[in-house]
Regions:
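Glycine-rich Rossmann-fold phosphate-binding loop(s) that bind the pyrophosphate
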Residues: 8
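N-terminal Rossmann-fold NAD(P) dinucleotide-binding loop
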Residues: 12-13
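NAD(P)-binding Rossmann-fold cofactor-contacting core
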Residues: 21-38
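Rossmann-fold NAD(P) dinucleotide-binding segment
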Residues: 42, 56-75, 84-85
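Rossmann-fold NAD(P)-binding glycine/threonine-rich loop
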Residues: 76-97, 108, 116
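Rossmann-fold dehydrogenase core element
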Residues: 86-104, 121-131
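Conserved anion/nucleotide-ligand pocket segment
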Residues: 109, 113-169
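Conserved small/polar residues in nucleotide/adenosyl-binding loops
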Residues: 172-173
Length: 173
């Protein structure tokens, strides 16, 4: 497989290392310094683009890959208010987009358990739910995509919850 890495920060470098260890090839590495190379000509021959950038850049990066006919895997968080718009564009163009706020198997199992527990708590009005997270000092987005996904899972299962606020991240009703 020949991959393009879009975003060569902490996560992008880790992805590059894993891809190379597993025998895959890196066809392009695109970050802020060469963002203008995110086009069909520079992505020719790429099998998949792995996009882990910033909230401000993600939408445009993914759209450019879709326009170039390159399937995209994205893990950038903090921009998902436009995710449905982008998924619609992707379908319209016949593209492929896979997005997750966290790619860790254990965390995705936790997402499922979270929803199940929220369903169980629906009947207990006397109890409430709160999410508090602590991260390393280099964490760029807060709340994290993982915390937001957990909050959205709770909101989807507990009818009295209508949203969340970041003071710190709390569910509201």
């Amino acid at each position: 497989m020949k991959a393009a890495i879009i975003g060569h920060g902490k996560m992008g470098r880790e992805i590059e290392k894993i891809l190379l260890e597993r025998g895959h090839r890196i066809g392009a590495v695109i970050d802020e310094a060469n963002a203008s190379e995110l086009d069909a000509a520079h992505l020719a021959g790429i099998d998949v683009a792995l996009e882990f950038t910033t909230p401000d850049a993600a939408y445009g990066n993914i759209r450019a890959c879709i326009d170039a006919g390159i399937p995209v895997v994205s893990g950038t968080t903090g921009w998902t208010n436009r995710l449905e718009e982008l998924r619609s564009y992707c379908r319209e163009k016949g593209g492929a987009l896979f997005y997750a706020s966290n790619y860790c198997l254990g965390v995705n199992l936790m997402f499922r358990l979270n929803r199940r527990l929220a369903r169980m708590m629906e009947r207990f009005d006397a109890y409430d739910v709160r999410i508090e997270e602590i991260h390393h000092t280099q964490k760029k987005d807060a709340p994290s995509g993982t915390a937001i996904t957990l909050a959205e899972g709770i909101i989807s299962e507990i009818g009295r919850k209508t949203g969340w606020v970041n003071e710190p991240l709390s569910l509201i009703h």
